[in-house]
Each structure stands twice: as structure tokens, then as C-alpha cells.
Amino acid sequence: MAVSTRVATKQEVPESRRAFRNLFNCFYALGMQAPDGSRPTTSSTWQRIYACFSVVMYVWQLLLVPTFFVISYRYMGGMEITQVLTSAQVAIDAVILPAKIVALAWNLPLLRRAEHHLAALDARCREQEEFQLILDAVRFCNYLVWFYQICYAIYSSSTFVCAFLLGQPPYALYLPGLDWQRSQMQFCIQAWIEFLIMNWTCLHQASDDVYAVIYLYVVRIQVQLLARRVEKLGTDDSGQVEIYPDERRQEEHCAELQRCIVDHQTMLQLLDCISPVISRTIFVQFLITAAIMGTTMINIFIFANTNTKIASIIYLLAVTLQTAPCCYQATSLMLDNERLALAIFQCQWLGQSARFRKMLLYYLHRAQQPITLTAMKLFPINLATYFSIAKFSFSLYTLIKGMNLGERFNRTN
């Protein structure tokens, strides 16, 4: 007896929205949004407490942290050039981070609305292979959140360790009432405070950077599932080709094709929910990535000592995580959409009714329209844009290196 791959029980149907569980737990910890079922959503008292917590977190990250970085440069007279550059490469990110936080927090309802479209697409899954693909995606996305958090925490920890080895605070932030040069005790207090500030900032940064990668990956999975269903058009439940089906089977094939067209429209609506959010946050990141990478490479190859080089290299890898994975997923989404159009050609359309072929032509026309994501309608979000930014930052480093600033600075000192 052939083993059927159909699953009839509703309880076994996976949910793509579970891929965002760890992500929204991070948003919850940052005071951005309380998930359904949490205490702030079930108790008015906890709702007020969480609202106060959110205000404190927003004031801290949007106002105080950038202010600490900016004011610190008024007191940079006693700082070494490596310390200035280490602080500057992070300060660029910290000062621009509020724009990303505001853009993301303002558009969180759009991301939540996307879950309704995902639920409609998940309901179309019928085979165990489809369920397994969704479960693997859920597992990967939740692990990816931890991967980002760990990578950013490694940078923060490495900078903290290097600070103690060099006897200087990690970023020499302006902290009222503290002068790290006055005593060893004040140095230790300042270093620990900066470490905590940077860890919290990294939590924000990692959450703001990973969400786009996760959402685009989930959309890619839905496109791949749709392509699998389209390829099976014109076949029976066992996968056997029906070249000249009877009238009843032709109607069933037409109905399945209609459902695939509706799935494609739902997928486009899903993209309409998430693309404006990604557009705004990645635009901000594109604007500063070249400056950050250029500053970091100048620090690594010209001024930094061995300990600072290690921390700066880790930071450069973290900066790569801010844009490269999102650009990769956007490029892969375009390729998956092209494979969807090819899947239409591979379905069993020969011998089908005229109505089926007309609908298939309409579907082919819609599917051949490319899915292109843009950053504020100015820059395409793809790997070509990322490599252009990387080339520009390397050109900036080459220009600075050609000016022999390192030798001039050493002669001056």
C-alpha cells in the first residue's frame, strides 16, 4: 500500500509566524511591543508599567546614548587616535540607530499584519514535505536571532577586554561625574557602564538588523512552496500525469490553478506589508555603511595595535551582518520568483481545457513581473548594491592611506 503524504489533522499544520517568536521576544525586552498573551496585554496595571518601561527605553536609546557619544568628543584631547577611531566607528552606528528604531517601531503593525497573510498561505499546505519545509524555516529563523545577538555580543565583549588590556575605557564616553583618568576605581566603573550600554545597544542593533532577513526568508519559503504546487498542476494525488483528463478532473485542475493564483496575490500582499518597513530601515543602513567600513579599515590597517585590530575586525564582520544577509535574501527572492515563472512552464498544461490555459497565461504574465525591493525607491536592495558600498568604502580607505596620515601622525607625536 502506498504511503500517502497527505496530512488530514489540523493540529499538525505548522505556522510560519512562529519564525518570529524570538524576534518579538527581543522587541518585548526592548520595550517596543508586548506580544499577545503577555502580562501587559492582559492586565491594565502591567500595561501601564510596560508603557513606562517603554518610555524609559526609548529616551535612553534615542536621546541619551547618542548624546553620550557626541559630547565625548569635546573631551578627546587625552585620547589616543586608536581610541578615537574605535569610538567613532561605533558612534556613527549609535547616532543613526534612533532613525532605524523609530522607523521599525512605527511600522510594527505592518509586520504584525503580515502574519494574517502568512496564515492564509500556511493553510494551503497539505503534504508532509511542505510542513517540514516550514518547520525548518521556523527553526532557522529563531536560531538566526540568537546568532545575530551572539555575534554582536562577541564584539562588545572583545572591546571590553581590550579596554582593560590597554588601560583605557572602550569608547571613552562622556558620563557625568566620572573621570576615568583620575583613579583605577573610576576607570573600572566607566568601563563596566560602557560595556552595559554597548550590550543594550547591540541588542537593539541586532534586532533591527535581523528582522528583514527573517521576513524575506519566510517569504522565500512561501514562494518555493507555491512553485512546488504550480509544478504539480495537471497531475493526480499520486503525482501521475493526466494528459487528457475527463471533464470533472479538468474542473478540479482549474480550481487548483485558481487557488494558486490567489496564493500568488496573497504573497504579493504579504510583500506589500513588509517591503515599506525594510525599505526605510535598510536605507538608513546603506547611508552609513560605507563610512563605518571605511573608518574601521583605517583603524585596522593604519593606526590600531594588535588588541584593537582584533576588536575592529570583529566589528567589521558585525557591520557586514547589518546589510549583506538582507541583500542576499532580497537577491534570492528575485531568483525564487523567476523559478516560479519557470514552474508554470513545467506544469502539465497539455490536454487541459481552454479555460485552464487562459488562466495559466494570465498567471504567467503576473509571475514574470520581477520582485524588486528598493531602499526608499533610490537603491535596489540586492548584492550588487552591497558590493558597490563595499567598493566605495575600500576606495575611501585607499584614499586616506595614500595621504600617509599614519606616518604624519606618528611624526607629530
UniProtKB/Swiss-Prot annotation:
State the GO CC annotations: dendrite membrane; plasma membrane
Q: How does it sit in the membrane?
A: Multi-pass membrane protein
**Tissue expression profile of the protein:** Expressed in olfactory sensory neurons in the antenna.
Which keywords label this protein? Cell membrane, Glycoprotein, Membrane, Olfaction, Receptor, Sensory transduction, Transducer, Transmembrane, Transmembrane helix
- GO function terms (MF aspect): ionotropic olfactory receptor activity; ligand-gated calcium channel activity; odorant binding; olfactory receptor activity
Q: Which GO terms describe its biological process?
A: calcium ion transmembrane transport; detection of chemical stimulus involved in sensory perception of smell
Where do transmembrane segments lie in this chain?
51-71, 90-110, 145-165, 187-207, 282-302, 310-330, 370-390
Question: Taxonomically, which superkingdom?
Answer: Eukaryota
The residue ranges for the Cytoplasmic side of the membrane come to: 1-50, 111-144, 208-281, 331-369
Describe the family membership recorded for this protein in Swiss-Prot or TrEMBL: Belongs to the insect chemoreceptor superfamily. Heteromeric odorant receptor channel (TC 1.A.69) family. Or2a subfamily.
What function does this protein fulfil?
Answer: Odorant receptor which mediates acceptance or avoidance behavior, depending on its substrates. The odorant receptor repertoire encodes a large collection of odor stimuli that vary widely in identity, intensity, and duration. May form a complex with Orco to form odorant-sensing units, providing sensitive and prolonged odorant signaling and calcium permeability. Highly sensitive to the sex pheromone of the silkworm moth, bombykol. Intriguingly, the fruit fly detectors are more sensitive than the receptors of the silkworm moth, although its ecological significance is unknown.
What's the protein here called?
Answer: Odorant receptor 7a
